């Protein structure tokens, strides 16, 4: 039963009376009382003993970090996750409101300033799904499309925003469903026109792109399976096939309650949805279909990857598939929870930590491993506040809704606040699946690389005694990825608003992704039995927030960014083989490099100045430099956006409109190359990126021409 969004009653403090040379029994009782008091304090920061006098100096900064790290509690995080995963909580459903209340009440119980930002969005749910196979001997087979018992509260596997309808035809196996896979089929005389295609999900294409390409090739319907088999349980991977992100009936503006909504037949809306039905399948069912296929043998490269056998045929075969999806699209209320921890000196500058709350099923990994870490960070921040700390800059803790449908909650919030974000957001720190296995992974915009590595040096590795996360990261992975992908809530912040961003997670992948088996039970038996990885992630995430909020000078390194731009330019030049000049890029990057070094020198000088509030001149210089450091990323935005995906404005990191792009950066240039555009068009895209880099240089340098 849902609880009202009210503040929980606070509890009075506990005092411990000191004593000398107690007898053994008293000593034992004292230890017990101390343990209980410590446990109580961690869970009820209102009861912390009188606050420390907090002043901003190196010693107190160190004490603050130590207090934050030492107040970690794996048992507490475990209890949060257990509560969050008691029931499925798909966005727009009643159980999702229970999860909303739990998160909201948790924040309020800590005494944190908390509010709900409500929106209205078009969501998609299944009403009927079926897949049957007919054979030439009149045998019929109906596939089981559920990965849980019939009376389970978990939503049946489906693709959100698939159109309702049926498709009947022979089956053709299309590998990962990429353009090159269809080219391979064409080379052996196989067409998918009038057929149902079977695709295995790969790394390069999302579900929506797989369906879009199949539709363009003349397929009637699409079945998609994942080779991980749901951890051996027969799990089926749910997901969305909507194109783009955000509420489809309020494209480009916030979906506020009572605001403008387009009709479902508006062209701006219909182009977001596929025109042919699609459904997810289990690996078990996919293998039945694969075994029935005749026709030509699959290309060698298909048979050398994944679980495709050496004798695999691509079809068509003697099996005819009849697939049906019936669904309904409904306007639903979605709710973001936002905590505000006001800054003491630069309250108008914001460091944002975010995680989504909604899940396809129970969501133990995706996303509530991240949610439980965020709840623990809030508990520890409340403890710091009781000790006398206040951040220099304002910190926001955000719990997003409806991410699984296409990052809807965060996108609507960004669209409503885009001007304020552009003027005052320092950074966005995203954690979606905090823990899905072993090993630390991260993606970031390059100016945050150095800060991230510094923080990793402060956190103990959960899997290697005596080592820091930085030491194991350096030996096992040591790659900070770039954020051109669109698969979590950082996308709108970086690609649309130009906010420096980080995305982090433990574990490269996990087998129960988006299945009914993503549960608390799976977490404690597989990914993190003792919740030590959760503790490490919460430590990294929270310390990043503290340092970005507290450091007098924002810890951004644009020399690192310049080096990365140069590496991107070199790779592009090699790809173009001299056919198109990259000189505009070279000149722009050279200028950016010089300005980055000047800014680094300026920061070095200012670090030697007094941090006293009374030193007005030094404070003004720091503020002016901080503003320039903060605004650089906005320079990479272009009002026209990426051709074909105009909502995405970032010209250095953003999603390429063409899935076959050979670059993970410069999306406009990458698309032009992938589409075999003329040299003039490619050159124009190069100039667009060069101008964006020049804008970033101007922002970092300050002043006017």
UniProtKB/Swiss-Prot annotation:
Glycosylation sites: 74, 137, 322, 676
Induction conditions: Down-regulated by abscisic acid (ABA).
Ranges where the record places region Catalytic: 255-548
EC numbers, comma separated: 3.4.17.21
Membrane topology: Single-pass type II membrane protein
Cellular component GO terms held in the UniProt record: endoplasmic reticulum membrane; membrane
CDD domains recorded: M28_PSMA_like
GO terms assigned for molecular function: metal ion binding; metallocarboxypeptidase activity
Transcription among keywords: no
Family recorded in the similarity comment: Belongs to the peptidase M28 family. M28B subfamily.
Protein name according to UniProt: Probable glutamate carboxypeptidase AMP1
């Amino acid at each position: 039963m849902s609880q009202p969004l009210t503040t929980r009653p606070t509890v009075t403090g506990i005092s411990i009376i000191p004593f000398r040379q107690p007898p053994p029994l008293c000593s034992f009782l004292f230890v017990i009382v101390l343990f209980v008091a410590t446990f109580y304090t961690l869970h009820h920061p209102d009861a912390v003993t009188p606050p420390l006098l907090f002043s901003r100096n190196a010693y107190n900064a160190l004490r603050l970090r130590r207090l934050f790290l030492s107040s970690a509690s794996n048992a507490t995080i475990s209890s949060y996750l257990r509560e969050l995963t008691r029931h499925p909580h798909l966005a727009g459903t009643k159980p999702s409101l229970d999860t909303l209340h739990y998160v909201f009440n948790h924040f309020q119980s800590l005494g944190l300033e908390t509010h709900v930002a409500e929106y209205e969005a078009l969501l998609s749910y299944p009403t009927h799904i079926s897949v049957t196979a007919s054979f030439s001997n009149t045998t019929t087979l109906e596939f089981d499309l559920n990965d849980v018992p019939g009376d389970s509260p978990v939503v049946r596997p489906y693709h959100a925003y698939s159109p309702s309808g049926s498709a009947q035809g022979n089956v053709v196996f299309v590998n990962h469903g990429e353009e090159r896979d269809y080219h391979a089929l064409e080379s052996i005389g196989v067409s998918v026109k009038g057929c149902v295609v079977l695709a295995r999900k790969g790394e390069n294409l999302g579900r929506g792109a797989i369906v879009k390409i199949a539709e363009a090739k003349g397929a009637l319907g699409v079945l998609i399976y994942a080779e991980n088999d749901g951890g051996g349980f027969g799990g089926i991977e749910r997901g969305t096939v909507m194109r783009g992100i955000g509420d489809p009936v309020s494209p480009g503006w916030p979906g506020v309650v009572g605001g403008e909504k387009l009709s479902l037949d508006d062209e701006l809306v219909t182009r977001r949805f596929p025109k042919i039905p699609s459904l997810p399948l289990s690996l078990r069912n996919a293998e039945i279909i694969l075994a029935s296929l005749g026709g030509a043998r699959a290309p060698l490269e298909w048979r050398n990857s994944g679980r495709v056998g050496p004798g695999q045929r691509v079809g068509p075969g003697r099996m005819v598939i009849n697939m049906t999806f019936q669904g309904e699209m409904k306007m639903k209320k979605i709710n973001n929870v936002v905590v505000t921890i006001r800054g003491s000196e630069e309250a108008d500058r914001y460091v944002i930590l975010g995680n989504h709350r909604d899940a396809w099923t129970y969501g133990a990994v995706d996303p509530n491993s991240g949610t439980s870490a965020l709840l623990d960070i809030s508990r520890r921040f409340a403890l710091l506040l009781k000790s006398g700390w206040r951040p220099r800059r304002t910190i926001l803790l955000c719990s997003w809704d409806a991410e699984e449908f296409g990052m809807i909650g965060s996108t609507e919030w960004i669209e409503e606040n885009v001007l304020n974000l552009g003027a005052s957001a320092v950074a966005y720190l995203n954690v979606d699946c905090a823990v899905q296995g072993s090993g630390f992974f991260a993606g970031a915009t390059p100016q945050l690389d150095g800060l991230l590595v510094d923080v990793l040096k402060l956190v103990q590795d959960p899997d290697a005694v005596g080592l820091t996360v930085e030491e194991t990261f350096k030996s096992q992975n040591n790659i900070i990825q770039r954020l051109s992908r669109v698969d979590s809530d950082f996308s709108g912040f970086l690609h649309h608003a130009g906010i420096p961003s980080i995305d982090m997670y433990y574990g490269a992948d996990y087998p129960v992704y988006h299945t009914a088996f993503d549960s608390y039970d799976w977490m404690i038996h597989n990914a993190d039995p003792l919740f030590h990885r959760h503790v490490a992630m919460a430590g990294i995430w929270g310390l990043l927030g503290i340092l970005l909020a507290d450091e007098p000078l924002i810890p951004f390194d644009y020399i690192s960014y310049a080096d990365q731009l140069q590496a991107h330019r070199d790779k592009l030049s090699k790809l173009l083989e001299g056919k198109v000049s990259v000189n505009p890029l070279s000149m722009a990057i050279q200028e950016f490099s010089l300005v980055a070094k000047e800014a680094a020198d300026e920061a070095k000088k200012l670090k030697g100045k007094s941090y006293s509030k009374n030193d007005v001149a030094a404070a003004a210089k720091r503020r002016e430099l901080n503003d320039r450091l903060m605004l650089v990323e906005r320079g990479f935005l272009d009002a026209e956006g990426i051709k074909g995906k105009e909502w995405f404005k970032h010209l250095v990191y953003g999603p390429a409109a063409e899935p076959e792009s050979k670059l993970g950066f410069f999306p406009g240039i990458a698309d032009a190359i992938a589409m075999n555009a003329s040299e003039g068009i490619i050159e124009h895209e190069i100039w667009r990126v060069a101008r964006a880099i020049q804008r970033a240089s101007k922002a970092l340098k300050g002043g006017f021409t």
